[in-house]
């Protein structure tokens, strides 16, 4: 994925948000088969299907993760059940500290659902 495509989607975000996006993508791309798919207003992280969406905000990165059930954590700000066995879980990433083992565990689980 070209950095310029990522930077285009996040052009209106503060520079630290672009740094967060690049750091998160670098970690996620260590998983097998991950493709970063730029859309008009966001980025999708795909394996066979999308397992996460990265949405720009001025001061933060809004991450939407797929899961089998709602993720129970105070970090999750919104959960939407999209089918009997799938939920979308929304959280804000405002600093590099938020890209931690807990978050990566959720991403690994979402990645497995997209196999």
Where are these regions (language model features)?
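Charge-dense, helix-prone N-terminal extensions
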Residues: 1-115
